[in-house]
């Protein structure tokens, strides 16, 4: 099945490059291009793509606000969003994830990781660039540690294994290969971890793993 994508970036050359990269993959179809946040919001609401690929810093509305309006907790029928940017500041990463983004990549991530993130988002999964996850954990380590939240129920042995790999920035597919289990099994474990830990995304799972010295 073809994954329909809207690409939003205010830099014409960058946007054209992203469209060209995605156009090389038969399973992906770019159905719209936006040069600012207002246009991105309008196109996404009208075209209902499978994935919105959006830059953080754009005129009109920034990528975080666009994400919040199409994928936030108050949205009844959210769109999958992957945020891509040259700015790797922690507030952008956390802001995007809290707004509902399913992926966060830096623009130097490379085509393969970009396509993986789009496929993951369309499948209801999430992919955060491993270098972003590692840096977030390093930043997290610098603050005064808080008492970690106790899980609602004890984690199973398999959930503990998945927890550590998520904290390393691994995708569900990579975890499935490492543990010799199906992709759906990994997704179930990640969903269970989020429920038990009260985590909203994979970064919060990773932060909990760090706080409890799992990694």
Which stretches of residues belong to each language-model region?
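Short hydrophobic/Thr-rich beta-strand motif most characteristic of the beta2 strand and flanking loop
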Residues: 27-35, 43, 199
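The feature encodes the CheY-like receiver
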Residues: 14, 54, 59
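Active-site residues of response regulator receiver
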Residues: 9, 55, 85
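Acidic catalytic/metal-coordinating carboxylates
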Residues: 36-39, 59-68
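Short, flexible helix-to-coil linker/hinge segments that flank and couple to helix-turn-helix
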Residues: 92-98, 102-103, 107-157, 161, ...
């Amino acid at each position: 099945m073809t994954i329909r994508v809207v690409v939003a970036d205010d830099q014409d050359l960058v946007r054209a490059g992203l469209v060209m990269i995605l156009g090389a993959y038969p399973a992906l179809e770019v159905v719209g291009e936006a040069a600012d946040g207002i246009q991105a919001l309008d196109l996404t609401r009208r075209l209902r793509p499978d994935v919105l690929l959006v830059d953080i810093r754009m005129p009109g509305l920034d990528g975080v606000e666009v994400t919040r309006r199409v994928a936030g907790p108050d949205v009844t029928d959210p769109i999958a969003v992957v945020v891509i940017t040259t700015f790797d500041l922690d507030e952008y990463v956390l802001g995007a994830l809290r707004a509902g983004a399913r992926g966060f990549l830096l623009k130097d991530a490379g085509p393969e990781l970009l396509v993986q993130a789009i496929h993951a988002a369309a499948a209801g999964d999430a992919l955060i660039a491993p270098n972003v996850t590692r840096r977030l954990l390093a930043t997290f380590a610098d603050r005064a540690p808080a008492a970690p939240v106790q899980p609602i129920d004890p984690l199973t042995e398999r959930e503990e294994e998945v927890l550590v790999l998520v904290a390393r920035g691994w995708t569900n597919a990579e975890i499935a290969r490492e543990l010799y289990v199906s992709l759906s099994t990994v997704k179930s474990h990640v969903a269970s971890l989020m429920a038990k830990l009260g985590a909203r995304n994979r970064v919060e799972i990773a932060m909990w793993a760090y706080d409890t010295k799992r990694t």
